Structure formats: C-alpha cells, structure tokens
Amino acid sequence: RLIRRQRQMCIRDRWKPEQLQLGFLKVLKGSYMYEHAKEYEAVYRAKPPYEVLRTKWLSYEDICNIKLAEEMLEVYYNSTQFPVSIRLLETIHESAYHMFENLGHFYEEHGYLAMSHTRIRRSEILLEYVESLGVADMEVFYQAATYDIYSRENAKSRPKWAKDYAQWKDVTRAYCPKGSLAHIECFDYSFEEDAFGRKCEPYSVSYTHLTLPTN
C-alpha cells in the first residue's frame, strides 16, 4: 500500500543505506500474485515485465506517483552524488517519500524526465525545485549544492549558483600552489552530516580566518 511505501522510506531515514530499491509488484504465471490477482483486483501488463498497474488498494495514479518517486530516488539518492543537498531538502518535507514524489512531479511538469542531464544540471534542477517552494533562505541550499560538487571533484566549470570564487582566489592560492591539484571552498554554513549519516569532511575554511603563510 502507499502508506507502507512511505513507512519504508521512513525506515531509510533510520538505517541510511547507501542504496535503496523501490520495487514494483509483478504478476508472474504460477506465482502467489497470479493466483490471487482477481481477489486483489489486480490489473497488470500482459507482456513482460508484467508489472501491476493498479489494485483494489492502489490506483493507477498511485502507481505512477510511486514510479516518479523511484526515479528521483535513483537520481538523487542511489547515485550518492547529492548527499548534503538531499539531507537538507528532507528537513523541509513531511517525509523522504513525499520529497522524492514532489520532486518527480516537478521534473514531469517541466519536461525534464525525457532529457539527459549532467550532474551540475541535476543540481540546478534541484535548486529550481527548492526555489519553487518559496524557501526564504536559498543561500544554504546553494552552498549545499556547491559542497556536493566540490567534495567529489575539482569541477572545471564553476556552477552558476556558487559564490564568485575570485573574491578569495588570490588568498587561497597560497594554500594551493599547484592550483588544479587542489581546491579550497569557503562556506557560511557547517554541513555536519550527509544523507547517508556520514560526517562531512572539512573541505571548507573561513575566508575571514585565512592567514597567508610566511616564507
């Protein structure tokens, strides 16, 4: 049932697994579901993968909503590419399930589902979604997205939502003499834990406390 799906997603909040699969029932000939299909008022595909389209508990619309949530779960959680952003986004939603479902509807409404997106573009869409919610303090979400980008790689292209790096580039260069081999990013917020319960490593330093090394 839909409520059960939501509860399973809440269990994820406690366990914080690195991967979570949101599966769908199939009606295979000879299986328990096949024998009880009429009792459950199950309507399912006549061809592989024989997925259930609706039951007496779940409408076709419910199934479609779950599929949207599943796709966003794969993109934003199971990919492990947006851990801090997702952790933060959860705090302004009733549950993780509602978060992924609503995000899926946002993708659908804007025609993003059928497109191929880069990781930075996925972050941009996530921020567009947050902006659509009317969040007062967007800066913390901008910086969370920046953290997710630079904690994985020294991105060649600066994300358009990120702060202008030029304001502290000369100062931080003293700590990164080899430039392209290192990156120091400055944040106004402390991100203590990501969506997987892992502690966030100190990739950031405070610009106001930087001191040039003496030779």
Which residues make up each language-model segment?
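A structural motif corresponding to the C-terminal lobe/cap of the Radical SAM core domain
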Residues: R5-Q8, R12-H98
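Single conserved hydrophobic/aromatic residue that forms the stacking wall/gate
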Residues: R1-R7, I11, H209-N215
